[in-house]
Amino acid sequence: MEEAAAAPISPWTMAATIQAMERKIESQAAHLLSLEGQTGMAEKKLADCEKTAVEFGNQLEGKWAVLGTLLQEYGLLQRRLENVENLLHNRNFWILRLPPGSKGESPKTTPSPSPRSSPRLNKGRSPATGAALTPRFQMFLWTPVQMQKLRPSRD
């Protein structure tokens, strides 16, 4: 049998095939450009996320430092509270209800009675007049040793 001879391709068919291939190539090129744009946007978003992560890390380090300081201060305040509780428990303190001096110094005056001699101190009232104390008056706790230092010497 004779092999079938290849049919000649008409120039019109060839031109149509080339045009179809050009359209397909143009479509693929447009899709490739779209993918390149999406890749660029994704890379930009990734860089922004990395920058934000670094900023959050720096802020977190600062917050950890502040938290550490707060925990140290809390420990100090806890010890001071325990000391005051011990003083109250042992009734080994004097209470003064005096405002601080104009320059922040402790006022020089005679101390209020101790809780041993006057167990019913009128809290929030002036010992002299009985009037309510204003918020600028503060409670100061003094041990008897500290009170001795406040008293003028009798030399």
UniProtKB/Swiss-Prot annotation:
Which superkingdom is the protein from? Eukaryota
Chain residue ranges for the region called Disordered: 98-132
**Amino-acid biosynthesis keyword on record:** no
Q: Which residues form a coiled coil?
A: 16-92
Keywords of the record:
Coiled coil
Q: Does the UniProt entry include the keyword Membrane?
A: no
Protein's recorded name? Protein ZNF767
Q: Which organism is it from?
A: Homo sapiens
